[in-house]
């Protein structure tokens, strides 16, 4: 009888352990992650526990612009937010690969886009107290607008709908606007050393970011050689960009790609030189005071994510 009495508590502890971020926070959906997602779906009806306290899951942002070239931002925006929030100790952020694995098990494919109305279900499966997602749109060439929505998973209550817009070259600033608004809405404690990390953008180079996002998507689709090429291109554009170096190293460690000397040298150089040269300048300092009336309403936008110009053929000289 004693075991029956404490069985619900034991189940809660097990589920919390399984849904907590692991020590290997990579970008590859492994066999173990897929098995976790399958088990969560199998046990969905028996999940009676409340969401894990201070746990935050960020879904992919849906591209509503009608421009396929902007699709890399769907995972890219979530990727940057997850990476930033993972440095804040007062909140537990669900790994991106767990969302990806769960979405695939739900039959949503490698895109990982959650169907409207199913967010609370996904939040429960991820054992997340809070859930955020959003849409990407725009009205003019190169003008970007990102509208997000922050939910309390258990009640589906909307906590806030922060938004930001700007030129495509300001993507790093747009992400930071949403980041600090989430922190404010959830009243998260951020220590000074954490704030210093949060103020550092993933990259200010739009080409580097585009390649990074495409690399992550290629990896999700199982095209690891293409992912490697995108990561290397990203690092070539900006050696200090976030995630790309670790993602490239992960592909090598898991023996998913053919390792060439160039790749080994690139990863080695990144290990030996850590730079903070991407720190925001005073002119780019982010505003951290927000007011409810300042939050823009949702609009539809058309934006084209710039592709790198094609290289002209080299003329042979006699």
Which stretches of residues belong to each language-model region?
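Short beta-strand->alpha-helix linker/helix-N-cap micro-motif
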Residues: 30-33, 45-119, 131-140, 159-160, ...
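Bacterial N-terminal signal peptides that target proteins for export
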Residues: 1-10
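Surface-exposed short loop/turn segments
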Residues: 112-149, 154, 251, 258
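C-terminal/domain-edge helix-coil "capping" segments
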Residues: 25-54, 141, 154, 158-318
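Bacterial N-terminal signal peptides
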Residues: 9-18
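Sec/Tat-exported extracytoplasmic proteins
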Residues: 62-65, 81-85, 89, 126, ...
């Amino acid at each position: 009888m004693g075991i029956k009495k404490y069985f619900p508590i034991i189940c809660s502890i097990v589920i919390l352990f399984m849904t907590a971020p692991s020590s290997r926070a990579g970008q590859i959906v492994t066999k173990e992650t897929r098995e976790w997602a399958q088990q969560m779906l199998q046990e969905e009806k028996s999940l009676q526990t409340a969401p894990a306290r201070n746990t935050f899951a960020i879904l992919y942002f849906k591209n509503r612009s009608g421009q396929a070239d902007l699709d890399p931002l769907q995972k890219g925006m979530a990727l940057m937010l997850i990476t930033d929030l993972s440095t804040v100790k007062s909140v537990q952020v669900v790994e991106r690969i767990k969302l990806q694995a769960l979405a695939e098990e739900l039959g949503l494919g490698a895109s990982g886009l959650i169907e409207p109305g199913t967010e609370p279900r996904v939040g429960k499966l991820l054992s997340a107290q809070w859930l955020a997602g959003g849409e990407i749109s725009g009205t003019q060439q190169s003008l970007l607008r990102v509208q997000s929505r922050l939910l309390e998973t258990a009640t589906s209550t909307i906590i806030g709908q922060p938004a930001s817009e700007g030129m495509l070259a300001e993507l790093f600033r747009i992400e930071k606007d949403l980041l600090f608004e989430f922190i404010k809405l959830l009243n998260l404690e951020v220590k000074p050393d954490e704030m210093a990390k949060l103020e550092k953008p993933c990259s200010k180079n739009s080409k580097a970011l585009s390649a990074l996002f495409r690399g992550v998507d290629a990896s999700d689709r199982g095209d690891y050689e293409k992912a490697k090429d995108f990561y290397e291109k990203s690092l070539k554009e900006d050696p200090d960009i976030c995630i790309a170096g670790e993602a490239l190293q992960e592909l090598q460690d898991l023996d998913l790609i053919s390792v060439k000397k160039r790749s080994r040298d690139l990863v080695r150089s990144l290990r030996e030189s850590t730079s903070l040269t991407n720190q925001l300048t005073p002119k780019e300092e982010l505003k951290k005071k927000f007011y409810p009336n300042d939050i823009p309403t949702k609009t539809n936008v058309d934006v084209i994510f710039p592709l790198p110009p094609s290289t002209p053929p080299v003329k042979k000289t006699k």
